[in-house]
A protein has these predicted regions:
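Structural signature of hydrophobic alpha-helical transmembrane segments
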Residues: 28-39, 80-93, 157-158, 207-221, ...
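Short loop segments and helix-boundary regions at transmembrane helix junctions
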Residues: 47-62, 66-133, 229-241, 258-261
Length: 269
């Protein structure tokens, strides 16, 4: 009897910790679905960032999204279309500016990204601080699972679908450009096009992830699973698969930890 009671107690605890949050609350189900979609799309993008030695560029673009999201917030509050559009425009503007500066100066692209992302982060924090509360600033920076509703989930699903299809179409030239960009440009001269499309995918995934993860932490679900998978495998297909699995596990564990401990979801994930 004592063993049965102990087993029953453990079963109840496991249910309360692992299943009840998703069974009882819509926002947790939305957040879980959002993390699943992000893992399927952002993790493969992160693999290409690692392969192309652009890990810090992903971080820089994550910071660059903030001022655009802040402007969207000042115009429309926490309206999803306003904040998402502002973040996407800001991310693309910074990516293009960094590329132009590196082309017309002696500075390399990663150095330009470092300068631009520090500036954009400072501007974004100032804008949100001027126009909102500390709660709004924490939401934009570190995410909130309470903010993941059906429209946010629809945005994430759309971005994930677009990313997966686009990566499937441009996989070969993107992989070749990651390994030998000079050869690709000599063969078809479209290396810059694939690079631009890839940057668009990076910014799209960062914008899609900001509701649950925040602008500062969205890049984490993109980079950390890819970096961890790189320690275990070298094959590109296995690298993508393992990074997606790591992202799914971290996303699930982070959501549960965020819910039970009552902390922002972005850092927890």
């Amino acid at each position: 009897n004592r063993i049965n009671k102990k087993q029953k107690y453990m079963d109840i605890n496991l249910y309360e910790w692992l299943i009840e949050p998703f069974a009882e609350f819509d926002f947790m189900r939305y957040a879980l679905a959002s993390v699943v979609f992000l893992a399927l799309s952002a993790a493969p993008v992160g693999v290409f960032l690692v392969m192309r030695r652009m890990s810090l560029v992903g971080d820089a673009l994550g910071h660059a999204v903030l001022p655009g999201a802040a402007v969207g917030y000042m115009i429309g509050g926490l309206s999803l279309p306003a904040v998402s559009a502002g973040g996407f425009v800001a991310g693309m503007v910074m990516a293009l500016l960094a590329g132009l500066v590196s082309r017309f100066t002696d500075l390399k692209e990663d150095a330009n990204f470092a300068a631009f992302y520090l500036t954009s982060l400072a501007i974004g924090v100032l804008l949100v601080s001027m126009g909102g509360s500390n709660i709004d600033l924490l939401h934009l920076l570190f995410g909130s699972i309470l903010a993941v509703d059906l429209p946010a989930l629809t945005l994430v699903a759309s971005v994930a679908s677009t990313t997966i299809v686009t990566l499937a179409v441009i996989y070969r030239p993107l992989l070749l450009e990651s390994i030998d960009p000079l050869f690709l440009r000599a063969v078809n001269g479209k290396g810059g096009l694939w690079h631009l499309i890839f940057l668009v995918l990076v910014v799209m995934n960062l914008v899609a992830g900001f509701q649950a993860l925040g602008t500062l932490m969205a890049v984490g679900l993109m980079m950390i699973p890819a970096i961890t998978a790189r320690l275990w495998v070298r094959n590109m297909g296995m690298l993508m698969l393992l990074s997606v699995i790591f992202a799914l596990l971290c996303g699930l564990a982070g959501l549960l930890f965020s819910y039970h401990v009552e902390i922002p979801s972005g850092p927890a994930i």
